[in-house]
A protein has these predicted regions:
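Conserved alpha-helical segments that form or flank metal/cofactor-binding pockets of metalloenzymes
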Residues: 56, 62-105, 176
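Alpha-helical bundle segments that constitute or directly flank the non-heme di-iron/ferroxidase center
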Residues: 16-24, 30-64, 126-149
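Haloarchaeal acidic low-complexity proteome signature biased toward cell-envelope/secretome components but also
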Residues: 1-27, 185, 189
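Short, solvent-exposed positions on alpha-helices
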Residues: 53, 68, 72, 153-157
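Long, contiguous binding/interaction regions
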Residues: 2-3, 99, 103-107, 134-135, ...
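Short, contiguous alpha-helical
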Residues: 156-188
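Acidic/histidine-rich alpha-helical segments that form the ligand environment
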Residues: 40-41, 58, 90-91, 104-164
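Generic structural signal for well-ordered, non-transmembrane alpha-helical segments
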Residues: 42, 46-49, 75-86, 127, ...
């Protein structure tokens, strides 16, 4: 017997639009251009999903002296990542696309590697988070230029606004990672 995929289908008769297709949009954006933009936004969405889950994991596993202060930041940062994800997913839909969701779509568009499921020290975890923020910030910058070049200034503005949020959170992570900010393991031994 063949293995069934881990997807739950409601039946083909209930599908309004298939994943990876572009329908009409009311924004006046040509379908081919909308397809390019949706593909780019799905890259961002995939990275946001991965980084959100990674930041939440690091929040859950915090312990020690940094728990309260750093925990508050990571929890709020995850919320901001979720808000950015929602804003971009709504834009994908407005452009006539279906936002990336689920492991297969995320893997297809992933600009980040998924962190192994281990519990790492705080410094290593934050370095990994900062790397994810840097990767996404670079992707957002590239896509701002691209979408504005093809005439979608509204998506460009959305990406610019959300880029500022990513950069602000990355700056906070940089401060936590400053030489003497975090307790080092050898100091506890």
């Amino acid at each position: 017997m063949a293995s069934e995929p881990h997807l739950r289908s409601h039946g083909a008769d209930r599908v309004r639009q298939e994943w990876n297709t572009i329908g009409e949009n009311e924004l006046g954006i040509d379908r081919d251009v909308a397809e390019e933009i949706v593909d780019a936004l799905n890259d961002e969405l995939s990275g946001l999903y991965i980084l959100f889950n990674q930041v939440r994991k690091h929040y859950w596993l915090l312990e020690g002296a940094e728990r309260e202060d750093l925990g508050g930041f990571l929890e709020a940062a995850a919320d901001r990542l979720a808000e950015t994800t929602d804003a971009l997913a709504v834009r994908v839909h407005a452009l006539g696309g279906v936002p990336v969701c689920g492991p297969m779509g995320i893997r297809q568009h992933a600009p980040l590697h998924i962190e192994a499921p281990h519990h790492y020290d705080v410094r290593s975890s934050l370095e990994r988070d900062l790397d994810g923020y840097a990767t996404l910030a670079a992707l957002f910058r590239d896509h701002v230029e691209h979408v504005e070049r093809v005439g979608d200034t509204a998506t460009g503005e959305l990406l610019r606004e959300r880029l500022v949020v990513l950069e602000e959170d990355a700056h906070v992570l940089e401060r936590y990672l400053a030489e003497d900010t975090l307790v080092r393991r050898e100091a506890l031994d």
